[in-house]
């Protein structure tokens, strides 16, 4: 039997748990004697707390504690910077002073014996403030843009003389874009159950990065990391909002310590819009210069994004502009707009999604100006190498993506003229855009145990917010060990498992997958070492180099006879599980040799009702060059999910802030619109064959981000094709299209 | 008083009751106003002392009878999750705006978050935990796995309960109909095409 | 949510007596429980009226008669609704979600509170929730707010789709009070905000909606509802229009039009109706008539687009109605 676990469309190994209600999320680990905590958020957008009338509330039924800066413990807040924390600035220190930095900032937490009692008390708590007017609008003249202090992603870059080339170009496009703030809005609200046992703390907590949450909470409380355990086997959607450890986790731990009992704290849906990050609103300007035959001579991309006063959130807003197109003169500039808001955070396709919305829209504008098909325009400017880094791509299949996508979509039959395609009274538009996202590979580790029954247990901290980590890691282990899938049990979501990087940035498959593979090879090596040293083994005395694993059996090289199985070897060695751990990391030399990215091409069809301003997506085809596809079924779901996310970005999602106090006005799932079932038409995801030996040992590139990135500009471009009107803000809504 | 009131959210203006309100002058000339959400903690405290007694509730969940004393404020969702430890029914928004809490209440799909348990004494409730027959998955559950009608899984219980309702109501006749009648269940991961395919398949299986 | 007591009643008399002692009726509760959780609503006593025998749906003569406790889903699916008043069925299905429609009652639908976000946020001024605290929307974000029937105190739209259809169809309602019954047009249920935006309807204390009656007529079959919104479903109307036409001999004899999403109450478009009478039912006539809809509009900073969208929505709804075979 030859095992082929990788590349097969296996159903999710955790599918049964999820369809029977058996998968347990953070808030579902109810503890004995558990109390309930509810956060009270600031009702001013800037200022100082004057008074908290805790006394009246403390007397209310069931209330066990009212904790604010007045009585909260002074916490250590030792320095800590996880990979998902901004490099510059200092995180919010919750309940440590009387300052209000943004609307909704936690100012108190109530603990009570029931959720109803806690909610009632939270609503009744009187807090008075010295309020000031916050600055929350990026267009406000009081906003002082700053250059990001550090980090390559935020640095201004330039090659050639883009401004001179733009001035000299025979054909130019110059346009500005405004993309709304978005909130991740996962289905599962942030939740933490905190339980202290002496000086040890256990947190059942929604997290995409359990080892960082462990380290951060340990730093905040000034305790050894080994005394903090974070558990999170399932994440009910994250999209980035659970990458950082937000203040509510600390609040839950404070509350549990204060009352001496386990405490459950779940944010309300409204609070999900206050303190758990958001995709920053961005303002961008793109200027393109081209020859009349469509060769780019200048690409200028300037952008700015919201950040808080206390941290610099930097995302990859302009980073793709250096390598997507062949162009001798490129200049990018990125600024941050510090305002009185909570710190933004990574949201699916962070930076790339916003930045490529602007650039891919501008390229589309250029295609009309030139009279060149937008796919052809991209082909004419396809670079041979990464011209920003002056490195070859480890692989780049963008043109193959365009070819495949165009064929599946039927792009050739497009009438290029705006407003030329119709269906009855509806205007039909076809649009296209490129997508790209880097191939990250961060150090990761994993552990494998082979049991006497011949099965394997595999562990890594990691997370599975939906892409299918449980399944794909099971496949990697099964393939590496030549075991059937049901002989492998993969566990994740515990901070005492081997450390892994954040479950974000499309790096789980590459990083954790490589670690799982390495650990499987390590446990095989360990078992082989034992076998050749074991007098009872038929392989006793063989040199370690003379044996090899073939389909889960250890044999002498060249000996066709099947050797002992895992079960026989483990049993023969006494029956105790044989365990090995291993780590994986990118070879630093490789990173200096290649530019590594996933690419995609997205084709969409929209209809626009010109009378009513209604845009509806009618179909979409995405083609992706994302390296090896470990599980086509799950990869397809991941891409379709990304397209749906991009649909939301294009046509619905917008967190609106009240300029007077910075409150998110539509902090409600009925008002912050995301696509519903009826909004989603037939969507196709296709993968081009791509073998990339450089990105990581598995040859995978990651899909989560690139799947979303091209969707919004493709839709915006299709809206132009349908209507002849270029809307340069997202989301595009009814009110934008009543004049078409 | 040299107040600049224009920047104050009208919000803070005339409530809570004046007796609880403070108007203070901050050092830099900024205006301070108290905002007491809800107000009237004093009268509420008195009322709550009297309401501590609790309400007796008998419900049948997935065929099992339960009798328990509840706070009349508790939704069926909170009773399931916090009292009966049946956590397959999810709290997504607690506002009737997402569908993650969908259960069958006396055979009909409803949002458990907007349903006061105390108003449903004697009710028969089916949650996602009660759909499979022992080890045997319901055809709709199996179809969700087959068509990968989920990613993170948090909306899935609600989707399946809603899908069962959709099929029972006769609204699963075509993909278009399923989409319209499943639009009360948000899936942020965007697994809608798989959800539609799963319900269409199960509808055929159930009706054949 | 503040604590409350719950009383289940079995008769209308019992219900009215309980209301007389300060009770607040609850049927489906999809609005009330939501707002109680936000502490926007703070009833101390709930009167559960779900056991009252007013769940009927039937034809009486040519009228469709609907008990106030009939559920949205039941009314939408009922053969008599589909036979006599397909507009009611269509309108109901466009509202909320299947789960909510299984629970929400017809009476409660008419009395649902507004969706203005400031109404729901206790730390925002709102004259409707807390009279005298100012309106946060009029000088703030108001893209979803009303352009008709506003005052300087409130601009929240009425969210019900059903009410739009009922007003277009000249439905009446019967209410039961302490020792009496009275009937009146549904149109008279809704108040304008004026200086008292917290008073939304004309029911007297303790009155219970018993029944809705939708008169039949030649217009009833040629009737459609159009709900314009950015999301295809599960969203309140940006603008909506119910349109019913009686066309005979190629001429509009009767027209009933009402709109949602634009008014502080469901808005009957009588001037548009008048402009249609005697005209051929074509797009030109519809467009000319629909121009009447925006007379007297008072757009706010963020909702000028509704002035443009309103007549277009009416035109499309009329076209849809005109296409009904």
Which residues does each PLM region occupy?
Chain A
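Flexible, low-hydrophobicity surface segments
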Residues: 1-151, 172-175, 248, 258
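Glycine-rich loop/linker segments at domain edges
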Residues: 8, 14-17, 84, 153-192, ...
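Extended active-site and interfacial segments that coordinate phosphate-rich ligands
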Residues: 13-17, 123-136, 208, 215, ...
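C-terminal catalytic domains of large/alpha subunits in multi-subunit enzymes
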Residues: 59-60, 69-70, 222-227, 257-263, ...
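Short acidic, glycine/serine/threonine-rich loops at helix termini
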Residues: 76-81, 121-124, 214-216, 239-245, ...
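Short Pro/Gly-enriched beta-strand edge/turn motifs at strand-loop
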Residues: 80-82, 167-182, 265-272, 425-434, ...
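Conserved beta-alpha junction segments in alpha/beta enzyme cores
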Residues: 162-221, 305, 315, 429-455, ...
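Conserved beta-strand/loop scaffold segments within soluble protein domains that form the structured core
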Residues: 213, 232-234, 239-329
């Amino acid at each position: 039997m030859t095992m082929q676990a990788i590349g097969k469309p296996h159903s999710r190994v955790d599918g049964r748990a999820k369809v029977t209600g058996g998968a347990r999320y953070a808030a579902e680990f109810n503890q004995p004697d558990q109390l309930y905590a509810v956060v009270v958020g600031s009702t001013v957008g800037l200022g100082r707390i004057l008074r908290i009338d805790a006394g009246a509330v403390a007397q209310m039924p069931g209330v066990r504690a009212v904790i604010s800066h007045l009585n909260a413990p002074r916490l250590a807040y030792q320095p800590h910077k996880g990979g998902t924390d901004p490099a510059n600035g200092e995180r919010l220190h919750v309940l440590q002073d009387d300052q209000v930095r943004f609307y909704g900032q936690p100012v108190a937490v109530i603990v009570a014996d029931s959720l109803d009692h806690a909610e009632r008390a939270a609503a009744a708590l009187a807090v008075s403030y010295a309020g000031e007017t916050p600055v929350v609008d990026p267009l406000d003249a009081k906003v002082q843009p700053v250059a990001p202090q550090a980090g390559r992603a935020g640095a201004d870059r330039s090659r050639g003389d883009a401004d001179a080339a733009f001035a000299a170009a025979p054909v130019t496009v110059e346009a500005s874009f405004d993309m709304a703030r978005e909130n991740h809005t996962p289905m599962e609200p942030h939740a933490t159950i905190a339980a202290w046992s002496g000086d040890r703390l256990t947190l059942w907590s929604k997290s995409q990065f359990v080892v960082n949450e462990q380290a951060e909470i340990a730093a905040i409380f000034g305790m050894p990391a080994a005394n903090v355990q974070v558990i999170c086997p399932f994440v009910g959607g994250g999209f980035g909002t659970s990458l950082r450890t937000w203040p509510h986790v600390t609040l839950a731990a404070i509350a549990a310590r204060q009352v001496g009992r386990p405490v459950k704290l779940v944010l309300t849906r409204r609070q999900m819009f206050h303190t758990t990050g958001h995709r920053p609103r961005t303002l961008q300007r793109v200027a393109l210069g081209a020859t009349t035959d469509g060769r780019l001579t200048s690409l200028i991309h300037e952008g700015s994004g919201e950040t808080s006063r206390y941290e610099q959130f930097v995302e990859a807003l302009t980073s793709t502009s250096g390598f997507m197109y062949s162009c001798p003169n490129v200049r990018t500039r990125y600024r941050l707009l510090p305002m009185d808001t909570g710190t933004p955070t990574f949201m699916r396709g962070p930076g790339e999604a916003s930045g490529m919305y602007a650039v891919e829209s501008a390229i589309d504008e250029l295609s009309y100006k030139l009279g060149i098909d937008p796919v052809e325009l991209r082909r004419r400017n396809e670079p041979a190498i990464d011209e920003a880094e002056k490195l070859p791509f480890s692989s780049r299949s963008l043109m193959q993506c365009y070819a495949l996508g165009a064929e599946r979509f039927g792009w050739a039959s497009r009438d290029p003229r705006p407003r030329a395609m119709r269906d009855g009274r509806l205007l039909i538009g076809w649009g296209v855009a490129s997508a790209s996202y880097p191939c990250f590979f961060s150090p990761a580790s994993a552990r494998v145990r082979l049991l006497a029954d011949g099965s394997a247990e595999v562990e890594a901290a990691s997370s599975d917010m939906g892409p299918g980590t449980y399944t794909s890691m099971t496949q990697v282990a099964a393939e590496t060990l030549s075991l059937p899938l049901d002989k492998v049990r993969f566990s994740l979501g515990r901070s005492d498992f081997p450390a892994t990087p954040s479950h974000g940035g499309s790096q789980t498959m590459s990083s954790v997958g490589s670690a799982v593979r390495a650990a499987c090879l390590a446990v095989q090596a360990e078992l082989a070492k034992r076998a050749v040293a074991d007098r009872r083994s038929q392989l006793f005395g063989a040199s370690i180099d003379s044996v090899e694993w073939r389909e889960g059996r250890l044999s002498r090289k060249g000996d066709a006879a099947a050797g002992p199985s895992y079960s026989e070897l483990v049993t023969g060695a006494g029956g105790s599980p044989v365990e090995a751990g291993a780590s994986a990391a990118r070879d630093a030399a490789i990173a200096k040799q290649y530019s590594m990215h996933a690419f995609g091409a997205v084709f969409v069809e929209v209809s626009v009702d010109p009378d009513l301003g209604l845009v509806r997506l009618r179909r979409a085809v995405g083609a992706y060059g994302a390296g090896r596809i470990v599980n086509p079924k799950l990869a397809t779901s991941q891409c379709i999910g990304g397209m749906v996310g991009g649909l939301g970005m294009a046509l619905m999602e917008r967190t609106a802030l009240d300029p007077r106090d910075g409150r998110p006005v539509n902090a409600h799932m009925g008002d912050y619109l995301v696509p519903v079932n009826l909004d989603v038409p037939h969507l196709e995801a296709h993968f081009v064959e791509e073998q990339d030996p450089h990105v990581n040992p598995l040859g995978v590139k990651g899909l989560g981000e690139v799947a979303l990135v091209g969707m919004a500009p493709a839709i915006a471009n299709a809206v132009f094709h349908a209507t002849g009107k270029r809307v340069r803000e997202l989301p595009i809504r009814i009110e934008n299209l009543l004049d078409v | 008083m040299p107040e600049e009131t224009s920047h104050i959210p009208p919000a803070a203006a005339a409530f809570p009751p004046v007796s609880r309100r403070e108007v203070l002058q901050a050092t830099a000339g900024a205006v301070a106003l108290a905002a007491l959400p809800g107000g009237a903690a004093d009268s509420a405290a008195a009322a709550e002392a009297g309401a501590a007694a609790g309400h007796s509730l008998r419900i049948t969940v997935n065929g099992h009878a339960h009798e328990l004393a509840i706070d009349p404020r508790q939704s069926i969702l909170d009773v399931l999750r916090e009292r009966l430890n049946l956590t397959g029914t999810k709290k997504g928004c607690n506002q009737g705006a997402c569908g993650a809490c969908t259960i069958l209440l006396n055979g009909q799909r409803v949002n458990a978050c907007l349903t006061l348990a105390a108003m449903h004494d004697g009710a028969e409730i089916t949650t996602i935990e009660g759909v499979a027959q022992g080890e045997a998955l319901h055809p709709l559950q199996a179809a969700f796995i087959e068509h990968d009608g989920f990613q993170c899984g948090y909306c899935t219980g609600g989707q399946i309960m809603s899908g069962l309702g959709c099929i029972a109501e006769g609204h699963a006749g075509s993909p278009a109909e399923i989409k319209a009648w499943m639009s009360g269940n948000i899936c942020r991961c965007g697994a809608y095409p798989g959800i539609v395919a799963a319900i269409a398949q199960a509808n055929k299986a159930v009706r054949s | 949510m503040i604590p409350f007591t719950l009383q289940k009643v079995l008769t209308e008399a019992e219900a009215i007596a309980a209301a007389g002692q300060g009770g607040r009726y609850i049927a489906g509760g999809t609005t009330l429980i939501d707002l109680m959780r936000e502490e926007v609503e703070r009833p101390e006593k709930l009167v559960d009226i779900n056991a009252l025998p007013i769940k009927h749906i039937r034809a009486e003569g040519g009228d469709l008669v609907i008990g106030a406790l009939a559920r949205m889903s039941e009314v939408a699916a009922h053969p008599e609704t589909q036979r006599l008043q397909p507009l009611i069925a269509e309108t109901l299905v466009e509202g909320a979600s299947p789960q909510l429609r299984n629970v929400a009652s017809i009476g409660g639908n008419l009395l649902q509170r507004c969706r203005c976000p400031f109404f729901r946020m206790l730390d925002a001024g709102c004259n409707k929730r807390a009279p005298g605290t100012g309106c946060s929307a009029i000088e703030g974000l108001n893209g979803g707010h009303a352009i008709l029937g506003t005052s300087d105190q409130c601009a929240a739209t009425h969210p019900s789709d059903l009410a739009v259809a009922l007003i277009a169809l000249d439905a009446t309602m019967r209410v039961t009070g302490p020792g009496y019954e009275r009937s009146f047009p549904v149109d008279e249920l809704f108040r304008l905000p004026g200086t008292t935006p917290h008073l939304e309807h004309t029911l007297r204390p303790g009155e219970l909606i018993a029944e809705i009656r939708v008169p039949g007529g030649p217009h009833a079959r040629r009737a459609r509802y159009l709900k314009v919104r950015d999301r295809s479903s599960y969203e309140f109307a940006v603008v909506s229009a119910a349109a019913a036409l009686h066309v005979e001999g190629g001429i509009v004899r009767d027209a009933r039009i009402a709109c949602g999403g634009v008014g502080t109450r469901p808005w009957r478009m009588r001037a548009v109706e008048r402009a249609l009478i005697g005209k051929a039912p074509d797009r030109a006539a519809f467009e000319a008539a629909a121009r009447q809809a925006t007379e007297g509009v008072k757009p706010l900073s963020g909702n000028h687009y509704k002035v443009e969208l309103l007549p277009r929505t009416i035109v499309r709804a009329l076209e849809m109605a005109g296409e009904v075979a």
